[in-house]
Design a protein with these regions (language model features):
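Hydrophobic alpha-helix immediately C-terminal to the catalytic Tyr-X-X-X-Lys motif of short-chain
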Residues: 130, 134, 138, 168, ...
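N-terminal Rossmann-like NAD(P)+-binding domain of SDR-like oxidoreductases, especially those catalyzing
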Residues: 1-151, 309, 319
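Amphipathic terminal alpha-helices
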Residues: 278-319
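Residue-level signal for the nucleotide or nucleotide-sugar donor/cofactor binding architecture
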Residues: 39, 68, 76-79, 122, ...
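Non-catalytic, hydrophobic alpha-helical segments
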Residues: 54, 200, 204, 220, ...
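Glycine/proline-rich active-site loop of Rossmann-fold NAD(P)-dependent oxidoreductases
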Residues: 129, 142, 154-170, 180-181, ...
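C-terminal "lid/loop" region of Rossmann-like NAD(P)-dependent oxidoreductases
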Residues: 187, 215-219, 230-233, 241-258, ...
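Hydrophobic "lid"/C-terminal helical patch
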Residues: 1, 204-208, 233-236, 282-289
Length: 319
Protein backbone atom coordinates (compact mmCIF):
# COMPACT_ATOMS: atom_id res chain seq x y z
CA UNK A 1 0.00 0.00 0.00
CA UNK A 2 2.86 2.37 0.84
CA UNK A 3 4.53 1.57 -2.48
CA UNK A 4 1.27 2.24 -4.31
CA UNK A 5 0.89 5.71 -2.81
CA UNK A 6 4.53 6.53 -3.39
CA UNK A 7 3.98 5.69 -7.06
CA UNK A 8 1.11 8.22 -7.02
CA UNK A 9 3.49 10.89 -5.65
CA UNK A 10 1.92 11.05 -2.20
CA UNK A 11 3.93 11.64 0.95
CA UNK A 12 3.86 8.45 3.00
CA UNK A 13 4.76 7.81 6.61
CA UNK A 14 4.85 4.40 8.23
CA UNK A 15 5.08 3.03 11.74
CA UNK A 16 5.88 -0.51 12.85
CA UNK A 17 7.54 -2.22 15.80
CA UNK A 18 9.00 -4.74 13.29
CA UNK A 19 7.99 -7.82 15.28
CA UNK A 20 6.08 -9.00 12.23
CA UNK A 21 8.24 -7.60 9.45
CA UNK A 22 11.67 -6.33 8.45
CA UNK A 23 13.16 -3.10 7.17
CA UNK A 24 14.08 -4.98 3.99
CA UNK A 25 10.43 -4.66 2.99
CA UNK A 26 10.51 -0.88 2.69
CA UNK A 27 12.64 1.87 1.18
CA UNK A 28 13.46 4.05 4.17
CA UNK A 29 14.77 6.72 1.80
CA UNK A 30 11.29 7.24 0.36
CA UNK A 31 9.06 6.60 3.37
CA UNK A 32 9.10 8.59 6.58
CA UNK A 33 9.44 5.52 8.79
CA UNK A 34 9.10 5.36 12.57
CA UNK A 35 9.97 2.30 14.60
CA UNK A 36 7.43 2.44 17.39
CA UNK A 37 4.65 0.46 19.00
CA UNK A 38 1.14 1.67 18.32
CA UNK A 39 0.18 0.97 21.94
CA UNK A 40 2.26 4.02 22.92
CA UNK A 41 -0.23 6.87 22.72
CA UNK A 42 2.35 9.61 23.24
CA UNK A 43 4.46 8.27 20.38
CA UNK A 44 1.44 7.93 18.12
CA UNK A 45 0.35 11.48 18.86
CA UNK A 46 3.80 12.75 17.85
CA UNK A 47 3.97 10.60 14.73
CA UNK A 48 0.47 11.38 13.44
CA UNK A 49 0.97 15.07 12.73
CA UNK A 50 0.13 16.92 9.52
CA UNK A 51 -1.49 13.75 8.17
CA UNK A 52 -4.66 13.62 6.08
CA UNK A 53 -5.53 9.93 6.40
CA UNK A 54 -4.47 7.20 8.80
CA UNK A 55 -4.62 3.60 7.58
CA UNK A 56 -4.38 1.29 10.58
CA UNK A 57 -3.21 -2.14 9.46
CA UNK A 58 -1.03 -2.99 12.46
CA UNK A 59 -1.99 -6.03 14.53
CA UNK A 60 -0.73 -9.21 16.07
CA UNK A 61 -2.79 -11.24 13.58
CA UNK A 62 -2.66 -14.52 15.44
CA UNK A 63 -6.16 -15.85 15.58
CA UNK A 64 -5.30 -19.31 16.89
CA UNK A 65 -2.64 -18.10 19.31
CA UNK A 66 -5.06 -15.62 20.87
CA UNK A 67 -6.71 -18.37 22.93
CA UNK A 68 -3.34 -19.12 24.52
CA UNK A 69 -1.79 -15.64 24.66
CA UNK A 70 -4.99 -13.59 25.08
CA UNK A 71 -3.45 -10.73 27.07
CA UNK A 72 -0.72 -10.09 24.50
CA UNK A 73 -3.00 -10.34 21.47
CA UNK A 74 -5.89 -8.31 22.88
CA UNK A 75 -3.61 -5.64 24.33
CA UNK A 76 -1.93 -5.13 20.97
CA UNK A 77 -5.04 -5.31 18.83
CA UNK A 78 -7.48 -3.39 20.98
CA UNK A 79 -5.37 -0.96 23.01
CA UNK A 80 -3.06 -0.43 20.05
CA UNK A 81 -6.02 0.40 17.81
CA UNK A 82 -7.57 2.79 20.32
CA UNK A 83 -4.21 4.51 20.68
CA UNK A 84 -4.03 5.08 16.92
CA UNK A 85 -7.64 6.28 16.71
CA UNK A 86 -7.13 8.66 19.64
CA UNK A 87 -3.94 10.13 18.20
CA UNK A 88 -5.61 10.57 14.81
CA UNK A 89 -8.55 12.45 16.30
CA UNK A 90 -6.30 14.60 18.47
CA UNK A 91 -4.35 15.59 15.34
CA UNK A 92 -7.52 16.41 13.34
CA UNK A 93 -7.00 13.64 10.81
CA UNK A 94 -9.76 13.72 8.20
CA UNK A 95 -10.28 9.97 7.82
CA UNK A 96 -9.30 6.70 9.47
CA UNK A 97 -9.34 3.39 7.59
CA UNK A 98 -9.16 0.37 9.86
CA UNK A 99 -8.21 -3.10 8.66
CA UNK A 100 -10.23 -5.52 10.73
CA UNK A 101 -10.35 -9.29 10.18
CA UNK A 102 -12.74 -11.96 9.00
CA UNK A 103 -12.26 -13.40 12.50
CA UNK A 104 -14.98 -10.90 13.44
CA UNK A 105 -17.54 -13.28 11.93
CA UNK A 106 -16.65 -16.41 13.84
CA UNK A 107 -18.43 -19.70 13.30
CA UNK A 108 -21.54 -18.68 11.38
CA UNK A 109 -23.10 -19.63 8.07
CA UNK A 110 -20.97 -18.94 5.00
CA UNK A 111 -20.45 -16.91 2.95
CA UNK A 112 -19.98 -14.10 5.46
CA UNK A 113 -21.83 -10.87 4.66
CA UNK A 114 -21.02 -7.51 6.23
CA UNK A 115 -24.56 -7.10 7.59
CA UNK A 116 -24.70 -10.50 9.31
CA UNK A 117 -24.92 -10.86 13.05
CA UNK A 118 -21.39 -11.85 14.01
CA UNK A 119 -20.18 -14.31 16.62
CA UNK A 120 -16.39 -14.30 17.02
CA UNK A 121 -15.07 -17.46 18.65
CA UNK A 122 -11.61 -16.35 19.77
CA UNK A 123 -10.06 -13.37 21.60
CA UNK A 124 -8.47 -12.11 18.38
CA UNK A 125 -11.84 -11.79 16.65
CA UNK A 126 -13.36 -10.21 19.75
CA UNK A 127 -10.54 -7.64 19.94
CA UNK A 128 -10.94 -6.70 16.28
CA UNK A 129 -14.71 -6.31 16.59
CA UNK A 130 -14.30 -4.25 19.75
CA UNK A 131 -11.88 -1.94 17.92
CA UNK A 132 -14.39 -1.54 15.08
CA UNK A 133 -17.17 -0.58 17.47
CA UNK A 134 -14.97 1.85 19.37
CA UNK A 135 -13.90 3.52 16.12
CA UNK A 136 -17.55 4.01 15.16
CA UNK A 137 -18.32 5.67 18.50
CA UNK A 138 -15.26 7.92 18.40
CA UNK A 139 -15.87 8.90 14.77
CA UNK A 140 -19.48 9.86 15.50
CA UNK A 141 -18.50 11.76 18.62
CA UNK A 142 -15.67 13.72 17.01
CA UNK A 143 -17.08 13.97 13.48
CA UNK A 144 -14.37 12.23 11.48
CA UNK A 145 -14.72 9.94 8.48
CA UNK A 146 -13.91 6.25 8.70
CA UNK A 147 -14.15 3.00 6.77
CA UNK A 148 -13.52 -0.57 7.86
CA UNK A 149 -11.88 -3.15 5.61
CA UNK A 150 -12.29 -6.85 6.33
CA UNK A 151 -9.54 -8.59 4.33
CA UNK A 152 -9.30 -12.37 4.44
CA UNK A 153 -6.15 -14.46 4.33
CA UNK A 154 -4.00 -11.99 2.43
CA UNK A 155 -0.97 -13.56 0.77
CA UNK A 156 1.85 -12.13 -1.27
CA UNK A 157 5.56 -11.33 -1.38
CA UNK A 158 7.19 -9.66 1.64
CA UNK A 159 4.98 -11.57 4.05
CA UNK A 160 6.78 -12.87 7.13
CA UNK A 161 7.37 -16.55 6.49
CA UNK A 162 9.25 -17.63 9.62
CA UNK A 163 6.26 -17.11 11.91
CA UNK A 164 5.07 -20.52 13.19
CA UNK A 165 1.62 -19.26 14.15
CA UNK A 166 0.17 -17.85 10.93
CA UNK A 167 0.31 -17.69 7.11
CA UNK A 168 -0.24 -21.31 6.12
CA UNK A 169 1.08 -20.89 2.55
CA UNK A 170 4.32 -19.35 3.80
CA UNK A 171 4.72 -21.84 6.65
CA UNK A 172 4.31 -24.85 4.38
CA UNK A 173 6.59 -23.40 1.71
CA UNK A 174 9.30 -22.59 4.25
CA UNK A 175 9.12 -26.11 5.70
CA UNK A 176 9.17 -27.87 2.32
CA UNK A 177 12.18 -25.83 1.20
CA UNK A 178 13.93 -27.18 4.31
CA UNK A 179 12.83 -30.71 3.34
CA UNK A 180 10.64 -30.87 6.43
CA UNK A 181 7.12 -32.28 6.39
CA UNK A 182 4.43 -29.62 6.90
CA UNK A 183 1.85 -30.05 9.64
CA UNK A 184 -1.91 -29.93 9.06
CA UNK A 185 -4.26 -29.43 11.98
CA UNK A 186 -7.36 -31.65 12.01
CA UNK A 187 -8.48 -33.41 8.84
CA UNK A 188 -7.34 -30.66 6.46
CA UNK A 189 -10.84 -30.12 5.12
CA UNK A 190 -11.03 -26.58 6.46
CA UNK A 191 -12.02 -24.25 3.62
CA UNK A 192 -10.38 -20.89 3.10
CA UNK A 193 -10.26 -18.12 0.50
CA UNK A 194 -6.96 -16.35 -0.10
CA UNK A 195 -6.63 -12.71 -1.15
CA UNK A 196 -3.69 -11.61 -3.27
CA UNK A 197 -2.27 -8.38 -1.89
CA UNK A 198 -2.34 -6.73 -5.32
CA UNK A 199 -6.08 -7.29 -5.60
CA UNK A 200 -6.65 -5.65 -2.21
CA UNK A 201 -4.82 -2.39 -2.94
CA UNK A 202 -7.43 -0.91 -5.28
CA UNK A 203 -10.23 -1.51 -2.78
CA UNK A 204 -8.23 -0.01 0.06
CA UNK A 205 -7.50 3.01 -2.11
CA UNK A 206 -11.23 3.57 -2.60
CA UNK A 207 -11.83 3.33 1.14
CA UNK A 208 -9.07 5.85 1.70
CA UNK A 209 -9.82 8.41 -1.02
CA UNK A 210 -13.44 8.12 -2.19
CA UNK A 211 -15.47 10.84 -0.45
CA UNK A 212 -18.70 9.07 -1.34
CA UNK A 213 -17.71 6.01 0.67
CA UNK A 214 -17.83 6.81 4.37
CA UNK A 215 -18.72 4.90 7.54
CA UNK A 216 -18.87 1.60 5.66
CA UNK A 217 -17.57 -1.92 6.22
CA UNK A 218 -16.37 -4.03 3.29
CA UNK A 219 -15.12 -7.57 2.89
CA UNK A 220 -11.98 -7.39 0.75
CA UNK A 221 -10.96 -10.41 -1.29
CA UNK A 222 -12.19 -13.10 -3.67
CA UNK A 223 -15.04 -15.51 -3.15
CA UNK A 224 -14.59 -17.51 -6.37
CA UNK A 225 -11.68 -19.79 -5.41
CA UNK A 226 -12.35 -21.53 -2.12
CA UNK A 227 -9.88 -24.23 -1.24
CA UNK A 228 -9.29 -26.80 1.49
CA UNK A 229 -5.98 -27.02 3.32
CA UNK A 230 -5.49 -30.48 1.82
CA UNK A 231 -5.93 -29.08 -1.69
CA UNK A 232 -3.56 -26.24 -0.89
CA UNK A 233 -0.93 -28.71 0.25
CA UNK A 234 -1.23 -30.68 -2.99
CA UNK A 235 -0.67 -27.50 -5.01
CA UNK A 236 2.44 -26.63 -3.01
CA UNK A 237 3.81 -30.17 -3.33
CA UNK A 238 3.31 -30.05 -7.08
CA UNK A 239 4.99 -26.67 -7.47
CA UNK A 240 7.89 -27.56 -5.19
CA UNK A 241 8.31 -31.14 -6.47
CA UNK A 242 7.79 -32.50 -2.96
CA UNK A 243 6.39 -36.00 -2.46
CA UNK A 244 6.15 -36.52 1.30
CA UNK A 245 2.75 -36.64 3.03
CA UNK A 246 1.84 -33.98 5.55
CA UNK A 247 1.80 -34.72 9.28
CA UNK A 248 -1.74 -34.56 10.67
CA UNK A 249 -2.21 -33.46 14.27
CA UNK A 250 -5.11 -32.59 16.56
CA UNK A 251 -7.38 -29.67 15.66
CA UNK A 252 -6.51 -26.31 17.17
CA UNK A 253 -9.17 -25.10 19.63
CA UNK A 254 -11.67 -22.53 18.32
CA UNK A 255 -10.55 -22.86 14.70
CA UNK A 256 -13.42 -22.03 12.35
CA UNK A 257 -13.96 -24.90 9.91
CA UNK A 258 -15.24 -22.88 6.95
CA UNK A 259 -14.27 -19.23 6.53
CA UNK A 260 -15.51 -17.71 3.28
CA UNK A 261 -16.53 -14.07 2.77
CA UNK A 262 -18.88 -12.65 0.16
CA UNK A 263 -17.36 -10.04 -2.16
CA UNK A 264 -20.73 -8.78 -3.45
CA UNK A 265 -20.64 -5.44 -1.64
CA UNK A 266 -17.06 -4.75 -2.72
CA UNK A 267 -17.95 -5.58 -6.32
CA UNK A 268 -20.89 -3.18 -6.23
CA UNK A 269 -19.31 -0.19 -4.51
CA UNK A 270 -15.55 -0.63 -4.89
CA UNK A 271 -15.47 -2.18 -8.37
CA UNK A 272 -13.65 -5.15 -6.89
CA UNK A 273 -12.52 -7.84 -9.29
CA UNK A 274 -10.11 -10.71 -8.88
CA UNK A 275 -7.23 -10.28 -11.31
CA UNK A 276 -4.71 -12.66 -9.74
CA UNK A 277 -5.59 -16.35 -9.54
CA UNK A 278 -4.85 -18.38 -6.44
CA UNK A 279 -2.30 -20.39 -8.39
CA UNK A 280 -0.50 -17.19 -9.39
CA UNK A 281 -0.61 -15.88 -5.81
CA UNK A 282 0.91 -19.06 -4.45
CA UNK A 283 3.66 -18.95 -7.06
CA UNK A 284 4.53 -15.37 -6.09
CA UNK A 285 4.90 -16.43 -2.45
CA UNK A 286 7.09 -19.37 -3.42
CA UNK A 287 9.30 -17.20 -5.63
CA UNK A 288 9.72 -14.63 -2.87
CA UNK A 289 10.69 -17.19 -0.22
CA UNK A 290 13.10 -18.87 -2.63
CA UNK A 291 14.71 -15.51 -3.38
CA UNK A 292 15.25 -14.84 0.32
CA UNK A 293 16.06 -18.40 1.33
CA UNK A 294 14.35 -20.71 3.80
CA UNK A 295 14.53 -19.56 7.42
CA UNK A 296 14.42 -21.09 10.85
CA UNK A 297 11.10 -20.29 12.52
CA UNK A 298 11.14 -17.68 15.27
CA UNK A 299 8.89 -17.87 18.32
CA UNK A 300 8.42 -14.21 19.23
CA UNK A 301 5.39 -14.62 21.46
CA UNK A 302 5.19 -16.18 24.91
CA UNK A 303 2.49 -18.76 25.56
CA UNK A 304 0.52 -17.23 28.43
CA UNK A 305 -1.64 -20.33 28.86
CA UNK A 306 0.26 -23.59 28.59
CA UNK A 307 -1.91 -26.58 29.42
CA UNK A 308 -3.43 -29.72 27.93
CA UNK A 309 -5.39 -27.62 25.41
CA UNK A 310 -2.33 -25.87 23.99
CA UNK A 311 -1.23 -27.32 20.63
CA UNK A 312 1.81 -29.56 21.07
CA UNK A 313 3.38 -27.99 18.00
CA UNK A 314 3.60 -24.70 19.89
CA UNK A 315 4.58 -26.10 23.29
CA UNK A 316 7.40 -28.15 21.79
CA UNK A 317 8.27 -25.55 19.12
CA UNK A 318 8.04 -28.25 16.47
CA UNK A 319 8.48 -25.86 13.57
Amino acid sequence: LAEYYLSKKHKVSGCDNLIGGTLDNIDVNKINFFKADCENLDEMTKIIKDVDVVVHTAAYPHEGLSSFSPYLICKSNYIGSISVFTAAIQNNVKRVVFCSSMARYGDIETPFFEEQKVRPVDPYGVSKLAAENTLKILADTHDIEYNIAVPHNIIGPKQKYDDPYRNVVSIMTNLILQNRRPIIYGDGEQTRSFSDIDDCIFCLDKLITDKNINKETFNIGPDEENITINELYKILCNKLKYNEPAVYVKDRPNEVKHAICSANKARKYLDYKTSVTLDESIQKVIDFIKSKGAKKFTYNYRLEINNENTPETWKKKVF
